[in-house]
């Protein structure tokens, strides 16, 4: 037990006596003045309140000016519009957002939409910036094969912005420009590319006339190869098969041989030939002189290629040739990711293979409880019959979340209407809507069978909830939903020769709060894959001196198109078994002529094995002639749903090696209303290991006008075990001007069990100059349960140059309910070197509005407080006499004396302890 010291030596003792004396005198003088001449207590002190409130309102107004969340509206500028591309699946995420998002490519623009009073359905704020892949389409030749090349690049969209009016999602309230503007912000969008160009509609081509004999027994296939055996069909992935063939005997015009694909593969991809006798034309096999050696077709139903020889072979022997053909997934027969048999029969010779489909998951959206989630795929495009139709599958709410006021927009374009051939209208579009019983049974390939028992058609329930009020947009009002839906789209495109680009968007709110607006989108587009072959033979005139035919030179597939999307599937570049150059016309060399929205002549030989999940929305209309040879083997799995729109001007050189074990489930709804003009040049080396489980309910309204100049040299080595139960009712109005230059190295282990109920109303006008160099090694065990009712309005302008090295291990279990009424206006210039490890969860003051969370860190302050105080100010009462100042001075002197006495007693109490 420590010995009590009543009197300290020298300075401290004298200082204590002097302060005690001054306090007593102040009480006496203040009481005399107060009771002698202070009789005008009826006069209202509205001036000080106005001043205080004005400063608060000014701060609030400034904060409001800088941090207000502008909820985008329908009338967003056209510059913000950007849509999602078609069979290149590109997810516009908001990101949220991340998208969601802003997408920087052709998916969505990142500029925030201009906002008006009421936000409209699709105008949204940008939350996260993500790069979206821009797929380049390849011009189509007469005999080209098409698949839906899907490239998913999920980009988060703005999702966390609040809706001021939950009805802003209602389509009837939106303007035509709104839908495109919704894309202009950071919507997540995913692109799918179908390998084709709609520049020229293919004529209806019947199967090659096979009037002759099946000569499979006279044809020998060799050097069979698959360009790759693993790919992602939803990311525009496909493979090529290449083979040589030799005719071992004489054949004549009309004779033919065949090749047959297994169930897991198709030769037509996502191109629909059902209106063209289910027959797809294949590029002719030509000789090196350009003569047609064989014509080829592909039967969609039987999955059989037929190669019919022309009269070129009538006088030829030793006919050798090769072919290279693109292969695609069969979405109906291979609906899930996995490995399938891929046994291919060429001229009755079986080549056994395995092929693995790694479908990108169609379950995509904003990663939060009420985040919008949607995806789509173009699964069939009619390019041959002239009917110009396409089929699209849309998964709505595949994450099966509880969503409110849900809208889905199906668009026939992405960024601009004039850049797509898609047509969405009541006459051009047929929609069927199905409710999903078991979401886990949805296919990975986007194939949906209307007769599947897992799907329940509910189209009739949406008859009055489908709108075509905006150009090239179908809007579906789903409302409050908890289930997953499948929308089957049968649409049309025009003959303008432009690529078919579509986009789907979902937006919704939290059904409980009608806030927390979320939006997510998905793009689809089409590109082309080419196939062909070559062959030659010797003349029968000189059988003894045959000219050897060219060995197989498989048709090179298109070079990989640079696509800054996640998991870009390198485009096929198969050249197995190189042979003499086949006729260039027969090779249908599709390495060039990339009809890319980006206008890029990129002769780029890029081996990009990049598994990048980068949600990039790149709107790059860059006309760049880049001859780049890049071997980038980047496995970047960056699912960066970075919703960080942080506008932080912090000149802080913080070397924070913080090993923070902060089990602080910091519910810091820190919609940080920090309109603090703090010039903090803080070099903080904080190695903080803080295990703080703090439940603090501090409702503090502090008006602290403190100007304190404290020069204190305190070396305190205190080991205090304080179990203090203090009930203090103090009302403190402290006007203190504090200039404290304190260098404190405090290694404090404090275990204090204090139960303090402090209702403190203290009016303290203290001018203290304290220069404190305190080395306090205090071991205090404090378990403090403090109920302090403090109302503190603190207008603090702090210029703190703090170099804080805080190595504090604090285990503080504090339950503090502090309602303290302190009026302190503190102008503190504190140069403090503090080592602080704090983990606090603080509830904002009662009289200040809590700002909503914003992904950009913007806070929406309200200036209603200022207006209200101006309106509700108390009328002036009483006489404005000259004695008012004397009364106030007396009261302040009395309170100052009380405060000094109180501090003296508190010091005595500590010394006794």
Swiss-Prot record:
Membrane topology summary: Peptidoglycan-anchor
Residue ranges annotated as motif YSIRK-G/S signaling motif: 15-26
Motif segment (MIDAS-like motif): 272-276
Chain span(s) of sequence motif LPXTG sorting signal: 874-878
Taxonomic superkingdom: Bacteria
Site annotation Cleavage: residues: 197-200
Pfam families: Big_8, Gram_pos_anchor, SdrG_C_C, YSIRK_signal
Main location: secreted
Stated induction or repression of this protein's expression: Expressed on cells only at early exponential phase with aeration.
Entry keyword annotation includes Electron transport: no
SUPFAM superfamilies xref list: Bacterial adhesins
Family affiliation: Belongs to the serine-aspartate repeat-containing protein (SDr) family.
Record NCBIfam families: LPXTG_anchor, MSCRAMM_ClfB, YSIRK_signal
Name of the protein described by the UniProt record: Clumping factor B
UniProt source species: Staphylococcus aureus (strain Newman)
């Amino acid at each position: 037990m420590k010995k009590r010291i009543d009197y300290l030596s020298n300075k401290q003792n004298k200082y204590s006596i002097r302060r005690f004396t001054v306090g007593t005198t102040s009480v006496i003088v203040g009481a005399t003045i107060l009771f002698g001449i202070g009789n005008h207590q009826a006069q209202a002190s509205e001036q000080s309140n106005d001043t205080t409130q004005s400063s608060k309102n000014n701060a609030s107004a400034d904060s409001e000016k800088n941090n207000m969340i502008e909820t985008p509206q329908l009338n967003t500028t056209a510059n913000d519009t950007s849509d999602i591309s078609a069979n290149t699946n590109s997810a516009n995420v908001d990101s949220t957002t991340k998208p969601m998002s802003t997408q920087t490519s052709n998916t969505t623009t990142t500029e925030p939409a201009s906002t008006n009073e009421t936000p409209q359905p699709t105008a949204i704020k940008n939350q996260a910036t993500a790069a979206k892949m821009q797929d380049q389409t390849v011009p189509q030749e007469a005999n080209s094969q098409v698949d839906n090349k899907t490239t998913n690049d999920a980009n988060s969209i703005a999702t966390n912005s609040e809706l001021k009016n939950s009805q802003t999602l209602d389509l009837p309230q939106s303007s035509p420009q709104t839908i495109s503007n919704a894309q202009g912000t950071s919507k997540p969008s995913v692109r799918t590319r179908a390998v084709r160009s709609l520049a020229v509609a293919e004529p209806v081509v019947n199967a090659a006339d096979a009037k002759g004999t099946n000569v499979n027994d006279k044809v020998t296939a060799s050097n069979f190869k698959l360009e790759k055996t693993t790919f992602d069909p939803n990311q525009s992935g496909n493979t090529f098969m290449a083979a040589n063939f030799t005719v071992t005997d004489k054949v004549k015009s009309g004779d033919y041989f065949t090749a047959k694909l297994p169930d897991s593969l198709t030769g037509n991809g996502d191109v629909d030939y059902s209106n063209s006798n289910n027959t797809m034309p294949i590029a002719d096999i030509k000789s090196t002189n350009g003569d047609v050696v064989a014509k080829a077709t592909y039967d969609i139903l039987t999955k059989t290629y037929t190669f019919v020889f022309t009269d070129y072979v009538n006088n030829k022997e030793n006919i050798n040739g090769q072919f290279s053909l693109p292969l695609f997934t069969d979405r109906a027969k291979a609906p899930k990711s996995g490995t399938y048999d891929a046994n291919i029969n060429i001229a009755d010779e079986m080549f056994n293979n395995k092929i693995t489909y790694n479908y990108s998951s169609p379950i995509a959206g904003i990663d939060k409880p009420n985040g919008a989630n949607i995806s789509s795929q173009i699964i069939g495009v009619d390019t041959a019959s002239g009917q110009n139709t396409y089929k699209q599958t849309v998964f709505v709410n595949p994450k099966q979340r509880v969503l409110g006021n849900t809208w889905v927009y199906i668009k026939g374009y992405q960024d601009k209407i004039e850049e797509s051939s898609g047509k969405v209208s009541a006459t051009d579009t047929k929609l069927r809507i199905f409710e999903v019983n078991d979401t886990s049974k949805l296919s990975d390939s986007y194939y949906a069978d209307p007769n599947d028992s897992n799907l329940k058609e509910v189209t009739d329930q949406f008859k009055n909830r489908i709108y075509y009020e905006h150009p090239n947009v179908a809007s579906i009002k789903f409302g409050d939903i908890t289930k997953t839906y499948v929308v089957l789209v049968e649409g049309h495109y025009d003959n303008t020769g432009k690529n078919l680009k579509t986009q789907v968007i979902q937006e919704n709110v939290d059904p409980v709060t009608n806030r927390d607006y979320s939006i997510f989108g998905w793009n689809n587009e089409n590109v082309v894959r080419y196939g062909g072959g070559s062959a030659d033979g010797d003349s029968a005139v000189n059988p003894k001196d045959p000219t050897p035919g060219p060995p197989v030179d498989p048709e090179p597939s298109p070079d990989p198109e640079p696509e800054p999307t996640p998991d870009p599937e390198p485009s096929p570049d198969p050249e197995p078994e190189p042979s003499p150059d086949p006729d260039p016309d027969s090779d249908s060399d599709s390495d060039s002529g990339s009809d890319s929205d980006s206008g890029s002549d990129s002769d780029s030989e890029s081996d990009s094995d990049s598994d990048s999940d980068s949600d990039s929305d790149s709107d790059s209309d860059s006309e760049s002639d880049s001859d780049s040879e890049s071997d980038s083997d980047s496995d970047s799995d960056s699912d960066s749903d970075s919703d960080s729109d942080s506008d932080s001007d912090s000149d802080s050189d913080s070397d924070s090696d913080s090993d923070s074990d902060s089990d602080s489930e910091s519910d810091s709804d820190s919609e940080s209303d920090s309109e603090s003009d703090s010039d903090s040049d803080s070099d903080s080396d904080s190695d903080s290991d803080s295990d703080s489980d703090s439940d603090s309910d501090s409702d503090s309204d502090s008006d602290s006008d403190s100007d304190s100049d404290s020069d204190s040299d305190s070396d305190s080595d205190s080991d205090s075990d304080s179990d203090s139960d203090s009930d203090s009712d103090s009302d403190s109005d402290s006007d203190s001007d504090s200039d404290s230059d304190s260098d404190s190295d405090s290694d404090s282990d404090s275990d204090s069990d204090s139960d303090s109920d402090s209702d403190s109303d203290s009016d303290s006008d203290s001018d203290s100059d304290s220069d404190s160099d305190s080395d306090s090694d205090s071991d205090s065990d404090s378990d403090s349960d403090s109920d302090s009712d403090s109302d503190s309005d603190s207008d603090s302008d702090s210029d703190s140059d703090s170099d804080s090295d805080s190595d504090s291990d604090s285990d503080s279990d504090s339950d503090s309910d502090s309602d303290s009424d302190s009026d302190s206006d503190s102008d503190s210039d504190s140069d403090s070197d503090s080592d602080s490890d704090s983990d606090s969860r603080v509830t904002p003051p009662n009289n200040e509005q809590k700002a909503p969370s914003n992904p950009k860190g913007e806070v929406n302050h309200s200036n209603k407080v200022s207006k209200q105080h101006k309106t509700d100010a108390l009328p002036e009462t009483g006489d404005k006499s000259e004695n008012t100042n004397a009364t106030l001075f007396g009261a302040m002197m009395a309170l100052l004396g009380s405060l000094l006495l109180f501090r003296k007693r508190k010091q005595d109490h500590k010394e006794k302890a």
